[in-house]
């Protein structure tokens, strides 16, 4: 069985290429064997490889307030030929959950509970809760719009170079103010 969160990650990593999606799903099925479920960790390990690890390192660096490390990860991904939209897919996979949790908390829920409901893993709850508090509610409420803006920008709605658009997104997500 493919867990819902693992399926979402697989879609983000494989993109809209059904042939690649099917190939990766078959590879995962063989990898897990008789296990009952295919997990996010299985997808990250088998499908994502080095590029996925760089993406998770980048989002972790943003979470921890380490913008320079996040920019180094971005540079490695771009230098390796990773497509900017694919990089944004990995970033969006993480930050859409945080945007959803922010909306749930805005409606009166506790942030910790909202993060769980949004799909953040229990072992990462304290770090992401600290991140959102550092970011501020006002900026956290802009997460969805930032993700939409970069998606449109990379699809031709911006004159800025792709790298600059990605770097600007990382600055925003880090909680720093772009000058």
Task: Give the residues covered by each predicted segment.
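Small-residue-rich helix-loop
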Residues: 35-139, 177-178
């Amino acid at each position: 069985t493919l867990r819902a969160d693992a399926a979402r990650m697989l879609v983000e990593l494989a993109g809209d290429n059904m042939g690649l999606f099917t190939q990766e799903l078959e590879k995962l099925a063989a990898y897990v064997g008789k296990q009952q479920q295919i997990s996010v960790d299985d997808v990250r390990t088998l499908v994502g490889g080095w590029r996925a690890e760089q993406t998770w390192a980048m989002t972790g660096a943003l979470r921890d307030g380490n913008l320079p490390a996040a920019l180094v990860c971005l540079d490695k991904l771009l230098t390796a030929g990773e497509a900017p939209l694919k990089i944004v897919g990995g970033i969006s996979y993480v930050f859409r959950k945080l945007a959803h949790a922010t909306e749930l908390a805005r409606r009166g829920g506790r942030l910790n509970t909202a993060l769980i409901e949004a799909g953040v893993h229990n072992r990462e709850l304290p770090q992401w809760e600290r991140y959102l508090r550092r970011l501020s509610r006002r900026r956290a409420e802009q997460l969805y719009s930032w993700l939409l803006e970069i998606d449109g920008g990379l699809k031709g709605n911006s004159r800025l170079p792709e790298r600059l658009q990605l770097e600007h997104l990382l600055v925003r997500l880090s909680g720093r103010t772009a000058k």
